[in-house]
A protein has these predicted regions:
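Flexible, glycine/threonine- and acidic-rich loop/arm segments that mediate assembly and lattice contacts
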Residues: 1-242, 249-310
């Protein structure tokens, strides 16, 4: 008599199901772990940047204050607003599916809400770099980097070099020259490590330990964060396939330095709201939303090197 086949036996048994969902949609961004967030009242944060300092003069006995540039000029400022926007999506789960397909450690509603929350976090991280400030987007680092804060990479771009990194860090001055981070795409980080190996005998083991205990590479004591949300399809002077390296500072709570994420005081972080039953179908709706934004307090707290070809 023939033995039972695997196909037939499978009809009488179930495979073991692992609880949860294994992540397969991943974009590395080590920088997000250290980005500070500031809660604000209202939907916008206003702050003033120095434009022109009030002038002073060197004076001796009998010097009078008269005429232009005689110590009487007033300071001027530029008012800046960083607005909150909303990242949101609805998780809808059919009542029958929730009632009959939520065993084995996989609650259908919880899985869908978790997926929407992950999407919200990924959307923010993308906007942190690529947001253009138009429509409902907030301005990201590419948009926020001032024209005078760009390191020299030539008319058609350049490969990464130690000289570019040095100039990039020199442009960050709002904390008296302290630089809190360098961030680049994985492709550029590999090229940076190749530079170190080419030195011959140089160690590529310079690392910085983060508050959570993880270690990241470092340059001149400044942590380098891999961030794969940084595009590698930019164009400079006809050269395609370029990318950008950023360096800057993180705000320390004083609202005077570098960058900080923004969120609403009364609804900080990602919120999950039970909207209720759909009016015309057997669906329960949960709304996942995040009131968020990004502020660059000092323009001297962000610098970039665009046109990097590797």
């Amino acid at each position: 008599m023939a033995s039972v086949t695997l196909t037939e036996s499978a009809k009488l048994a179930q495979d073991e199901l692992v609880a949860g969902v294994i992540e397969n949609i991943i974009t590395v961004n080590r920088m997000f772990d250290v980005l500070p967030f500031d809660s604000i009242e209202g939907n916008s944060l206003a702050y003033n940047r120095e434009n022109v300092l009030g002038d002073v003069i060197m004076a001796g006995v009998g010097t009078t204050f008269s005429g232009a540039g005689a110590g009487k000029g007033a300071a001027t400022f530029t008012k800046v607003n960083s607005n909150l926007t909303t990242i949101m999506g609805d998780a809808e789960v059919n009542g029958l599916i929730q009632a009959t397909r939520s065993g084995d450690g996989n609650d259908q509603t919880a899985v869908q809400i978790a997926s929407k929350s992950k999407s919200a976090g990924r959307k923010y991280q993308d906007q942190l770099i690529n947001g253009n400030g138009a429509g409902n987007e907030f301005a990201g680092l590419i948009q926020l980097c001032a024209s005078g804060q760009t390191a020299t990479t030539g008319a058609t771009g350049s490969a990464i070099s130690f000289a570019i990194l040095d100039e990039l860090m020199d442009l960050v001055t709002d904390k008296d020259g302290q630089v809190d981070y360098i961030t680049m795409h994985a492709r550029t980080l590999r090229s940076y490590k190749a530079l170190l190996r080419a030195l011959g005998g140089a160690s590529i083991n310079e690392v910085v330990e983060l508050p959570g205990g993880a270690e990241v590479p470092a340059y001149s004591g400044t942590p380098i964060f891999r961030n794969d949300y940084i595009p590698t399809n930019q164009t400079k002077g006809g050269t395609t396939g370029c990318t950008t390296i950023f360096a800057g500072t993180l705000d320390d709570g004083s609202r005077t330095h570098g960058i900080a994420g923004l969120t609403a005081t009364q609804a900080a972080g990602i919120q999950v709201v039970d909207v209720g039953e759909s009016e015309d179908s057997d669906e329960h709706i949960w709304r996942v939303k995040w009131y968020c934004g990004l502020a660059l307090f000092s323009e001297k707290g962000l610098a970039c090197a665009d046109g990097i070809t590797n």
